[in-house]
Structure formats: structure tokens, C-alpha cells
Amino acid sequence: MGTRLEATEQSNHRTQRNDIQLENAKAAGKMGISVDLEAKYAKLGLNLGAITFGEKDRKKMKNSHLRKQENANISLAVCALLNSGGGAIKVKIENENYSLTRDGLGLDLEASLCKCLPFVQWHLDFTESEGYIYIYVKSWSQEIFGLPIGTLRTNLYVRSMSSSVQVSAAAALEFLQDLEETGGRPCVRPELPASIAFPEVEGEWHLEDLAAALFNRTEFQYEETFPFTRSRYVEVTLLSAKRLRKRIKELLPQTVSAFANTDGGFLFIGLDGKTQQIIGFEAEKSDLVLLESEIEKHIRQLPVTHFCEEKEKIKYTCKFIEVHKSGAVCAYVCALRVERFCCAVFAAEPESWHVEGGCVKRFTTEEWVKLQMNAPSG
């Protein structure tokens, strides 16, 4: 019934690394960020295009996507300068009759900057001149922050309780250091000693056993109940056929990263977590082939970092289980079993930027890990 697939780790060939770097540089360009080669206001300057400033005018913005993009652009530019010795960002003021002193930046922009820097006032200064806002950025300080570079998002996930949680840069560094010290970890987790009883742990493992039994089924009945809930080892979601491919693209990287970096687990698509009923999603056989291909592609593209000699691939099993109603197939459940990984799996390249060769570039996972691991301690 099901088809077993194994995703391969991201290629380390130089050509692919160059492609990633080029793609990341293009991404910065699409966001309207460019290096100001004629900047007189700073040794290194970035142009950020036009942005609406001030709490009152930002609240009036009807385009929520644009508002989010402006937040992302400022955060990205600040991160790039922090990691490049400092500099300044030049931003054209989009709205008329604006005053930095009177109107401020806007609370959402301030919140975004606070996520970049816990001590904004130590590293950023703001001035207004002739229709522009200038954001002066000091260089990143490992002495202050305890980390070698600034990072907006690590994109490294673990499973915590019943959620996939992105770890902080500090936690990611600790996780990577532990892996380096031990040379990776066994792909099979150690068994719980029989002489030690931890009811809460045994309870979670029991949920995993129930999920494994469901995974091994060959068919379900429509609205049949299942006897477990979300846990460290299990994630369930109910998606319509229309939203399936889009949500798979969003859900899969984080979930696979979290399960792989913890102790493995199961993802069931087509189970209603609220009613604990098996519903499934409608699909043709051709749709399942396409979906399986999409899942394989997304997992194959996940960045990985190895500290072991074996350099295992991400291992998983994907299968589609029929859901029957009145004796006929009415839907399918997508069941994905992800194995515990030997080292680190990222949901995407870490969101950490720098300026190099006249371009704003995103560090590749390989570059980011090396910078984190090779930084002097203390």
C-alpha cells in the first residue's frame, strides 16, 4: 500500500553552494535591499527603498503583506550590518508630514528590531534628514551577546511536549556543540532502563506505540476514532485537498526537523485532532503520486550538518492509507514516519545575513555552523 522513501541530505558540491548563495543574494535584491556604493553617511551603507513610518500611519496601512515585508526588510538589513562591522541604512520616508521626533518609528517596527537585538539602544541610532531615515548600526559584539554572529531565525527545530519549537541561536549552539563533542548520536534512541520508572515518559512512549499501530494499518473507516493525541512523538492535522500542497510546504520542514532532532515521530495528515476522528482528504491516485513526490522533494532539500563519520541520510517512510465509507474508498490519510537523526536537520537555511562583494547575502547553513562553532570562547 505505502511506498518507502528515503530523502538524501543536501549536496555539498561547490556548484550547489554557489547556487544557494546566488539565490540568497537575489532574495535580498527582491526585498529592495541594495548596497549604497556611493554612501557618504557611513563606511558601509544599505538602501532600503521607501517605508511608511509612525504608529498612526502604519496602523492605516491596508496591505498587511507590505507591512510585514517592511518589518522583514529592516530586520534583515540590520542583521547584515551587525555581521559586517556596522554601517548605516538609508530609508526613504513613504508618508508625508512625518516627523521622527513626533511620530516615532511605529510599534511593529520597534518590536521587529527588539527581536534582532535585546539591547537596541546600544547598537542602533536613528536620525531624520531631507525625507530619509538613517539607521546607524554598530558592529555585532560577541562579548555583549555571547554569540559570534547575529541571527534572526535559526530554523533549527526540536520537539517540545506536543509542539515543534524553533530553538534560539544560543540553544542551537549548545545543541551543535553537544553533537560535535559526541561525534553525533545513535539513530536509535537508548531504551529506558527497566529498573527506573518514569510514568510520564512511559506514557509518551505508549502514545508512540499507539501511533505506530495506526501507522501500520492498511485501511481506515471514515470517522473512526483514534486513541491518542498530539505528543512529543506524534503530530496530527486535518487539511482539505485544496490546501494540502501549500500546507505541506509550510508544515513539513518544521515537523521533520523537529522529529529528526529529537527522537523521531509520526505525522498524520487527515486526522482531526479535536474530535479524534479519522477523516482523510479526497484525492485521485495521480494526486497521491504528485504529493509523494512533493514530500520527497521538500525533505531532500532540508539542510543538514554532520559531526559523525557515517553521515547518514534523513530516513523516513511515507504511505497513503485508504479511508473507507459504505464499502468504498472516500479519502486517504498521509502517514509519515520520521526517524531520529544522527546529527542536525534544519527546516531551512538559518536567517543570518552579511554584506560581501557588494551584495547582501544570507549565510549558508555550512557557513553559519562554522562561524558558530569556530568562534573563540569567552
UniProtKB/Swiss-Prot annotation:
Record GO biological process: negative regulation of cell population proliferation; response to bacterium; T cell mediated immunity; T cell proliferation; T cell proliferation involved in immune response; tRNA stabilization
Gene3D superfamilies on file: Schlafen, AAA domain (3.30.950.30)
Name of one Pfam family that matches: B3R
Principal location: cytoplasm
Superkingdom, taxonomy of origin: Eukaryota
A GO molecular-function annotation: tRNA binding
Places the protein is found: Cytoplasm
Induction context: Upon interferon-alpha (IFN-alpha) treatment.
Record keywords, A-Z: Adaptive immunity, Cytoplasm, Immunity, RNA-binding, tRNA-binding
GO CC terms, sorted: cytoplasm
Effect of loss of the gene: Conditional deletion in T-cells leads to impaired T cell-mediated immunity. T-cell show an accumulation of tRNA fragments, which inhibit translation and promote stress-granule formation.
InterPro entries: Poxin-SLFN/SLFN_N (IPR031450), Schlafen (IPR029684), Schlafen_AlbA_2_dom (IPR007421), Schlafen_AlbA_2_dom_sf (IPR038461)
Tissues with expression: Mainly expressed in the thymus, lymph node and spleen.
Disulfide bonds listed in the record: none
Family of the protein in this entry: Belongs to the Schlafen family.
Entry function: tRNA-binding protein involved in T-cell mediated immunity. Plays a key role during the metabolic reprograming phase of activated T-cell, when T-cells produce reactive oxygen species (ROS): acts by binding tRNAs and protecting them from cleavage by the oxidative stress-activated ribonuclease angiogenin (ANG). Also required for T-cell quiescence maintenance.
Protein name per the record: Schlafen family member 2
Organism, as annotated: Mus musculus
Name of the encoding gene: Slfn2
